[in-house]
């Protein structure tokens, strides 16, 4: 078994030994220089002038190596006549001596590059300019000739006095049942087709009935409507069905009530969830008609109307126009009171349903002293100006002033109750009554 050579231990604090004598397997002593930094490929002394140089952390490229050599040559220059240069290690023939082109390249690379410190740029954050500062700046206060001319042209075209239209559907944008995206198109369509379902003046073809008998029938139907607690849509559709049927077929006097109760049955089936039973309708007629007679008349009405029941009644427009009026409960009750009051009278058939609804809103605003009586929003959504609805509004104001004296008091009793705001007790619009004093009966269209 081979013996291990004893290597003397190095005393702490003693200088490093330049060479170590190591015996190989044959016992021969081999001297070699102690290794320094393994990664130091350049023979640069570890300490120069007693100061330790910082380690090189960047990769040594050709240009960086040339710079290191140049710095080393500058440090080896004699100081105070001392021509001795410290040895950096074993001498090697430089590459530049063997290749003249490489020598010139090294000379170019040996140029000392002085790092120039860039001036520090101070970047100041701009202050946010508020709207008040912009408005108060003197530049914005200057009035140019072009701005004056443009302002005059806008005033001449009426752009300055542009009407203020309130978005009445703003609160219903999240309500999918309101159909806000289509509501304007729907009411434009209603106004186009309302003429098709508008009843014509028919008293000239009725030989056994007159206007007063029609008013008595509708007054009685209003009481039945209240008795069964039906919706307002049912009432307006019932009157529409009666007038349309009477405009195409002459009815004897004894069957007029039968036409009315059958029309109420049709409208209830169309609008109500739980329509009244036929036997209940027979009871309210005091058994004047049988169930079979009501069903036969129902079929006759549907046949003459060609089953056309989806019509824009006055109630369809009332809902929209009341919303455009920004109404309170008192205002809403007053509008319905005037609309139902006008529905009882035959003279209102000369006006289309949308005009009757708009006139009811206008007359109600005048009766409750709302200012202004007709707004830009109402004109936009109704499609009527104040002058266009004036004749119909005068008629409604005239009927309002006479309702307390009439024997047909179903509408008056209904809207005299506290649950409906007692709006029937409100005085009619004086501004419209003065003009309604010389009101003339409308000419049949």
From Swiss-Prot:
Gene3D superfamilies for this protein: Cyclin-like
SUPFAM superfamilies (UniProt xref): Cyclin-like
Induction entry: Transiently down-regulated by salt stress in roots.
Matches recorded under Pfam families: Cyclin_C, Cyclin_N
Annotated PROSITE patterns: CYCLINS
GO CC annotation: cytoplasm
Alphabetical GO biological process terms: cell division; mitotic cell cycle phase transition; response to gamma radiation
Keywords annotated in UniProt: Cell cycle, Cell division, Cyclin, Mitosis
MF terms in GO: cyclin-dependent protein serine/threonine kinase regulator activity
Tissue specificity field: Expressed in roots, stems and flowers.
Family per similarity comment: Belongs to the cyclin family. Cyclin AB subfamily.
Stated role: May induce mitotic cell division.
Subunit note: Interacts with FZR2/CCS52A1, FZR1/CCS52A2 and FZR3/CCS52B.
Protein name: Cyclin-B1-2
Originating organism: Arabidopsis thaliana
């Amino acid at each position: 078994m081979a013996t291990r050579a004893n290597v003397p231990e190095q005393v702490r604090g003693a200088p490093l030994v330049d060479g170590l004598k190591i015996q190989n397997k044959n016992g021969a002593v081999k001297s070699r220089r102690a290794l320094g930094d393994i990664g130091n490929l350049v023979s640069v002394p570890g300490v120069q002038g007693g100061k330790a140089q910082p380690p090189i952390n960047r990769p040594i490229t050709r240009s960086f190596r040339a710079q290191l050599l140049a710095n080393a040559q500058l440090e080896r220059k004699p100081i105070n006549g001392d021509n001795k240069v410290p040895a950096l290690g074993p001498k090697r023939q430089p590459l530049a001596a063997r290749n003249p082109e490489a020598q010139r390249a090294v000379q170019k690379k040996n140029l000392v590059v002085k790092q120039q410190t860039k001036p520090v740029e101070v970047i100041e954050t701009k202050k946010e300019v508020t709207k008040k500062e912009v408005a108060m700046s003197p530049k914005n206060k200057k009035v140019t000739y072009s701005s004056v001319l443009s302002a005059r042209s806008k005033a001449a075209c009426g752009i300055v006095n542009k009407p203020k239209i309130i978005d009445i559907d703003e609160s219903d944008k999240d309500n999918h049942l309101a159909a806000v995206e289509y509501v304007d198109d729907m009411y434009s369509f209603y106004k186009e087709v309302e003429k098709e379902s508008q009843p014509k003046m028919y008293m000239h073809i009725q030989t056994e009935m007159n206007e007063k008998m029609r008013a008595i029938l509708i007054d009685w139907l209003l009481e039945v409507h209240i008795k069964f607690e039906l919706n307002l849509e049912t009432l307006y559709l019932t009157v529409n069905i009666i007038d349309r049927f009477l405009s195409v077929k002459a009815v004897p006097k004894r069957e007029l009530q039968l036409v009315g109760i059958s029309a109420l049955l049709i409208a209830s089936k169309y609008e109500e969830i739980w329509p009244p039973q036929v036997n209940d309708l027979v009871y309210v007629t005091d058994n004047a008609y049988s169930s079979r007679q009501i069903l036969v008349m129902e079929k006759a009405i549907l046949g003459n109307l060609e089953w056309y029941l989806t019509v824009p009644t006055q109630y369809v427009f009332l809902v929209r126009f009341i919303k455009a009026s920004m109404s309170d409960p008192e205002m809403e009750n007053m509008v319905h009171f005037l609309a139902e009051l006008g529905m009882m009278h035959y003279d209102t058939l000369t006006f289309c349903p949308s005009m009757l609804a708009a006139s009811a809103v206008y007359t109600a605003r005048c009766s409750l002293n709302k200012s202004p009586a007709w707004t830009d929003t109402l004109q936009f959504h109704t499609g009527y100006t104040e002058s266009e609805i004036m004749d119909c509004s005068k008629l409604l104001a005239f009927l309002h002033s006479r309702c307390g004296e009439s024997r047909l008091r179903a509408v008056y009793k209904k809207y005299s109750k506290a649950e409906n705001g007692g709006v029937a007790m409100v005085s009619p619009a004086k501004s419209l009554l003065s003009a309604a004093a010389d009101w003339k009966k409308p000419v049949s269209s």
